[in-house]
From Swiss-Prot:
This is Probable carboxypeptidase 2. It comes from the Eukaryota. Glycans are attached at residues 46, 116, 393, 459. Zn(2+) binds at residues 136, 139, 224. Its cofactor is Zn(2+). Its main location: secreted. It is found in: Secreted. One of its GO terms (biological process) is proteolysis. Residues 1-21 form the signal peptide.
Amino acid sequence: MVAYRLLALISLGLGSHCASALQYGYNQLSTHKDSAVVAGAFPAINGTHLQSPAFTSPGTVPRGFSDGTSGPTRDETMEGFMRRLARSNSWMAYHEADFKSEEGRKFPYMYLSASNSSVENPSSHKLRVWLQGGVHGNEPAGDQSMLALLGDLAANQKWAAKLLEKMDILVLPRYNPDGVFYFQRYLATNFDPNRDHVKLARQQTRDIKELFTRFSPHIATDMHEFTAGRTFGPKKDIIYAADALFSAAKNLNIDEGIRQLSEKLFAKRMGKDIEAAGLRWDPYITQGESSSSKLLLLEAGTDAKIGRNAMGLSQCVVFLCETRGIGIADQHFERRTLSGLVMAKSILQTAVDNFDEVYNTIERGIRRFTNSRNDIVLTDKSPIMERTFGMLNITDASLFDYPIDFATTTPAEAVLTRSRPRAYLIPPSWPDIVKRLEVFGVKADKLPYSYVGPVEALNVTSVTFDKEYYEGVVTTTVQTKLVERNIRLPAGSYLVKTNQKNAALAFVALEVRTKDLLPVLIMDVY
């Protein structure tokens, strides 16, 4: 079997981002708060004392939060809160990233460690944990739960010390400060920050990805909110009952041991912890299209352009954590923030309580993946099963289990696989591809000599274009035929070996049959 693959690409010149019905800034959704009947199913939880600015300093909350035109915590309020915590706690270090948002806003983050470690020089034999919120700017419980976690750690010094015996933690509470300013989902340029993890179209995505890559976490979480009022059923009179939806990374190119650790240890514990807090949960889902009258819900998918899977492809445990909040402004905000806090704390506590199992499983998984000769997975499918999903009737607030068809990705089933190449060859005319790979943490060796020899290549036999722009490109579906040929490439070409930790990110970026790829034309040899 020939082990090298040639990447010779032709640009399609697809033009710039086009997004319908969006303006520059303030792309805000309409607000539809819960009725009094529905709100009764989401009461305040007794004994809740959240240690974040929206709750400890309610006078700082902008008026617009009550009508869904603003979040609860301005940048300067958040930064002041973080700085005060860092001044009062030697194990908390306040940092500002050496890059800015698209509109020039800062990225403050906290580094928590009981030693003198840093992002570039982390503690040895400890877990590295990355926690982020505020990816979508109109999901305020995401970043607020991260601030509440910082406040909770400062208020519970013994618990913090117990955690930091076993881990270093980086908290980036606000991934998308421009989106938070405009209270909109998107970046300032109207790209979705959670759909840019393979294309890396925006510099902001690349900058944050490089920080993530330098830290190289064992565990990561991504805090979001989901739409509260979406209705289902023949009468459109039922909604999700859950306070929290969550999902591990699902891409099949993540080491199986790491995926099983996520599902069998972390996910099970998280569900129990949510229930113990008096809250409700279900797996993260989206609605699918079905030819039957039965509701089809799709479990979180495997797509690498989503942050959860992109982070997981660096061979780490990752969870998307969503709380019920989009579209209801400030309603139930304490309960929403608590839901996010409970999930984040559950992940940290599970890791510490099972430190040896977690650390050793992830480290073994990294080594196993790096040295693997198993096939790589390019496409997959989600088997459909029957199950129930927690719903709430909006007419009387009754809670019940609703029968659905469920497209599961725990696990997904591989459809198209390919033998794992020893390396990829990239001509010197494509340095931008190499720069993208380097952002992923993938090393590319520049060859001082010309390459002459056999390669395995893909001949593109058909290309079907989608009918509209998506995130700045026209997406395509391609068919290919595997060919072997001899090639000659000049000195200065790049060799990307696949026996490295982050090679799965090269697979999803370079293999022509995966999603969200590089441009090709029919009859290209790739």
